[in-house]
């Protein structure tokens, strides 16, 4: 079933029937098959929807006109674009700056999203690019706005949106590159710092920073033990980009892999570290972390370990007890718990 935002978009499908269009971060991959125009391309920053879109296109016998990237190539030239509004305002602003640079003069911008996700602010987000912004639909607790790009458009450079911050935990100093839309943008969040404070030892084997965000844990581990073989993974193209940049800034050699959960990862790990997500967009979603905990034992070496930090209210301890022989609480505060689990 299509997401509510995609259902609202399809109510105005006639707007997309002509010309070359770009769908930006659609919330499901099947919307492309529901559109009659074959000249609809996908710009994806989330690997799960990217994979879903590719699979759907192949099943329909369509060309796979999809890219999983942090920023879309502005050499492209589209008649229109549809932005599925992201949760973070700054992320939406960055995406719009990228998208308008991909449009032909006088191109059309559509922004669709849920009421709870801040879609009512879309008109303000569009005003830097258009004097002609209109709300054209409202249904299924969503809304859609349309604008014609009639103001001058600047070139887009993702590096201008980057934030580089410096941090020190224990005796290790490190730099972090982050972008809007990446977890804890521009900051070292309290939970991650608590996890870092409780990493006594990093082994010289293969280690994983799961749901790596800006790559903080992976870079810290690589600096703590330069002999470690660091792997970082995330579902977000922005996180992949930032983790690669963070690794470069710190001189850490790391393999950074886009993955929906553990699906794209091969081989086994001696240590796994994570501050796992519990949101998908604006919705609370425990499925990613629960799936990770259930599958991880197949990716851990004998006597391998997991160190995980989580908000105390998430109650992950019971699931960890089911999946691991040994579960130890390393430390806890009023907000967070850090667990060490072994096969």
Curated annotation (Swiss-Prot):
GO cellular component entries: cytoplasm
GO MF, any single term: 16S rRNA (guanine(1207)-N(2))-methyltransferase activity
Pfam (any one): MTS_N
Location(s), subcellular: Cytoplasm
InterPro entries xrefs: Mtase_sm_N (IPR013675), rRNA_ssu_MeTfrase_C (IPR023543), RsmC/RlmG (IPR046977), SAM-dependent_MTases_sf (IPR029063), Small_mtfrase_dom (IPR007848)
Principal EC category: transferase
Disulphide bridges, residue numbers: none
Keywords, alphabetical: Cytoplasm, Methyltransferase, rRNA processing, S-adenosyl-L-methionine, Transferase
CDD domains reported in the protein's UniProt record: AdoMet_MTases
Catalytic reaction list: guanosine(1207) in 16S rRNA + S-adenosyl-L-methionine = N(2)-methylguanosine(1207) in 16S rRNA + S-adenosyl-L-homocysteine + H(+)
Domain of life: Bacteria
EC number: 2.1.1.172
Gene3D superfamilies the record matches: Vaccinia Virus protein VP39
Family recorded in the similarity comment: Belongs to the methyltransferase superfamily. RsmC family.
Quaternary data: Monomer.
Function: Specifically methylates the guanine in position 1207 of 16S rRNA in the 30S particle.
Name of the protein this chain belongs to: Ribosomal RNA small subunit methyltransferase C
Gene from which this protein is expressed: rsmC
